């Protein structure tokens, strides 16, 4: 998992509350277990005018030239609600997003973001509204998200602070997913197995 330290990136606006996981990545695209290749289907029903995904909807915000290459998604309350699917953060990450800023998230989606190297920032509704105004009026506006300092710096230079669980912060900052955390305990696991082979050798008989 790629470490998350400081992110300087274009912020794309998705001015909709209660965006559910079926809108983030529709169910017909959940047929594989690899984590890549989902970005093209992100927000499929909004991004495209046809089922095949060949005709872009010019009215949808992410299709606007000003948001090309965006790595931060600025959105509204209760993002990621609906059915549980880890494909939702996979699709966002595969598209290019590394962080989301919103007033609130659905719990399962919120947890899945951390497990997949994405930082879901929670700011107050009025702070999100300020960022919406400053970004919408500034083409190519970039935000800076500093995980160590737990700050978001807007286009005007105003700094917002956010909270993040210390363990999740440690994992993101060091690029550690569940497998990475386990591998860090490799020497202890090896010592345990060695001891176990001595006292319970029958467990290792093939």
Swiss-Prot record:
InterPro entries: 3-IsopropMal_deHydase_ssu (IPR004431), Aconitase/3IPM_dehydase_swvl (IPR015928), AconitaseA/IPMdHydase_ssu_swvl (IPR000573), IPMI_Swivel (IPR033940), LeuD (IPR050075)
Top-level division of the source organism's lineage: Bacteria
GO molecular function: 3-isopropylmalate dehydratase activity
EC number assigned by the record: 4.2.1.33
Catalytic activity: (2R,3S)-3-isopropylmalate = (2S)-2-isopropylmalate
Broad enzyme group: lyase
Pathway given in the UniProt record: Amino-acid biosynthesis; L-leucine biosynthesis; L-leucine from 3-methyl-2-oxobutanoate: step 2/4
Subunit structure, interactors included: Heterodimer of LeuC and LeuD.
NCBIfam families, per the entry: leuD, PRK01641.1
Name this polypeptide is given: 3-isopropylmalate dehydratase small subunit
Organism: Leptospira borgpetersenii serovar Hardjo-bovis (strain L550)
């Amino acid at each position: 998992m790629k470490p998350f330290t400081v992110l300087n990136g274009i912020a794309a606006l998705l001015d909709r509350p209660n965006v559910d996981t079926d809108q983030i990545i529709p169910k017909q695209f959940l047929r594989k277990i690899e984590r890549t290749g989902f970005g093209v289907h992100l927000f499929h029903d909004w991004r495209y005018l046809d089922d095949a995904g060949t005709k872009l909807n010019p009215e949808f915000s992410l299709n606007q030239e000003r948001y090309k290459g965006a790595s931060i998604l600025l959105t509204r309350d209760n993002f990621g609600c609906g059915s549980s699917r880890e494909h939702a953060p996979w699709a966002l990450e595969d598209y290019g997003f590394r962080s989301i800023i919103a007033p609130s998230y659905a719990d399962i989606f919120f947890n899945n973001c951390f497990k997949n190297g994405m930082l879901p920032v929670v700011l107050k509704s009025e702070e999100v509204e300020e960022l919406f105004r400053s970004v919408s009026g500034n083409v190519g506006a970039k935000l800076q998200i500093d995980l160590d300092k737990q700050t978001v710096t807007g286009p005007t230079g105003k700094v917002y602070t956010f909270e993040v669980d210390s363990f999740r912060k440690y994992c993101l900052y060091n690029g550690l997913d569940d497998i990475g955390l386990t591998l860090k305990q490799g020497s202890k696991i090896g010592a345990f197995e060695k001891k176990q082979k001595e006292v319970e050798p029958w467990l290792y008989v093939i």
